[in-house]
A protein has these predicted regions:
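Single conserved hydrophobic/aromatic residue that forms the stacking wall/gate
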Residues: 1-9
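Flexible, glycine-rich active-site loops centered on histidine and acidic residues
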Residues: 16-50
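Short, well-ordered, mixed-charge alpha-helical segments that flank or form enzyme active sites
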Residues: 26-31, 76-80, 125, 198-200
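Condensing-enzyme catalytic core mediating Claisen C-C bond formation in acyl metabolism
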Residues: 36-100, 105-108, 138-149, 155, ...
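A short, acidic, amphipathic alpha-helical segment used as a generic capping/interface helix at domain edges
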Residues: 99-104, 170-182
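Long, repeat-rich segments with strong aromatic
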Residues: 100-130
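Short glycine/threonine-rich loop-to-helix capping motif typified by GTGT followed
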Residues: 121-136, 201-208
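Glycine-/charge-enriched secondary-structure boundary and capping motifs
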Residues: 143-168, 180
Length: 224
């Protein structure tokens, strides 16, 4: 959202430079949304590991770096998931709806992009998005991945379903994906950050966890 809003402000002349930054912390997230580490609870296979990390992007009105060419603002999607240890499944429908809306609004097909990356769906959410597009007759194999799959070694580090948190997508985009764009390894990136409108109190009362997703297209070679 901050990347998208920053680009809007820049394009409308409200700002010459805008900073989009965020962070997350493992212990803080566990204590606030699940259980304190001292509790010693066993993590479920669907649980993800909140990234202790941060990332920042500087958006400018001019320059030669990668450009934000499209912004697709998502809408809330609620699949009825109530398990705070299965956030990937809770957020996946929102990612699917936003990506589908992006392709419909722009007239682009998935293969227009060199890489499509979601924020922090992890192994479970990534599989859900793949399946939803397969049901539409669209195969994203080899084209689509998720920051939660990229930031950790899932097997070697035993992080169960992968990484999560605001810092997950921010760190992967600022520290890895932008380098791919700048080096020319990829030229067109569709980045769809994911999130949840989650309240610990509502979750304890058994209420569902709605998801949200906003997408930005970042390109190094723009057709004019």
């Amino acid at each position: 959202r901050s990347r998208g809003l920053g680009d809007v402000y820049k394009r409308q002349g409200y700002a010459e430079h805008a900073a989009a930054l965020t962070s997350s912390h493992f212990c803080s997230a566990e204590r606030q949304y699940r259980f304190p580490l001292e509790y010693g609870g066993v993590r479920t296979p669907t649980a993800q590991w909140t990234v202790t990390g941060s990332g920042a992007l500087i958006l400018g009105a001019s320059g030669n770096g990668p450009r934000v060419t499209m912004v697709t603002t998502g809408k809330i999607a609620d699949a009825g998931i109530t398990d705070a240890n299965n956030m990937g499944a809770a957020m996946a429908p929102a990612a699917y709806e936003t990506l589908k809306a992006h392709f419909a609004d722009t007239g682009r097909t998935p293969d227009y992009y060199d890489l499509i990356v979601t924020g922090d769906l992890g192994k479970i959410g990534h599989a859900v998005v793949m399946r939803l597009f397969q049901d539409d007759g669209i195969d994203l194999t080899g084209l689509y991945t998720d920051c939660g799959l990229l930031i950790y070694d899932l097997e070697g580090q035993d992080v169960h379903a992968g990484g999560s948190g605001c810092g997950c997508s921010a760190a992967v985009l600022a520290g890895h994906l932008l380098k791919l764009l700048e080096s020319g390894q990829i030229r067109r990136l569709l980045f769809a950050a994911t999130g949840a409108l989650m309240s610990p109190t509502a979750s304890m009362q058994g209420e569902s966890i709605p998801g949200i997703c906003h997408a930005v297209a970042i390109e190094t070679q723009v057709n004019t």
